[in-house]
Amino acid sequence: MTAVENVALPALYAGVKKNERVKRAIEALESVGLGERIHHKPSEMSGGQRQRVAIARAIINNPRILLADEPTGNLDSKSGEEVLEIFKKLNDNGTTIVMVTHEEDVAEHCKRIIRLKDGVIEKDEIVYNRRGV
């Protein structure tokens, strides 16, 4: 399955017609910097590119909230920064990003940090001077 086919799947499940699905999938891939990779398969992409395909798939139906569980966990630092920049742009355009991470440097990109310990909220802070997802 190519990147554009993969990204279009949620729109298929939502009942979107094929032409509109493909158009949205291409737009989503372009928005995450993969416009030139739409016909590539996962085996032809780096880990960071595959993660951006997953983000494009998650945003194709324009969700108000995006849940991200360890979105940078398996990425090198450059690819991780690219993913966080995509999240920042999505957030700037009105999408709420709920991100789970164990990495302090990733959490530093967030506007609000809720720390859990043993399943209990230990600290809830809004941080205004962050780079902001």
Regions inferred by a protein language model and the residue ranges of each:
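Conserved beta-strand-loop-alpha-helix hinge in the C-terminal portion
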Residues: 120-133
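ABC family nucleotide-binding domain
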Residues: 1-116
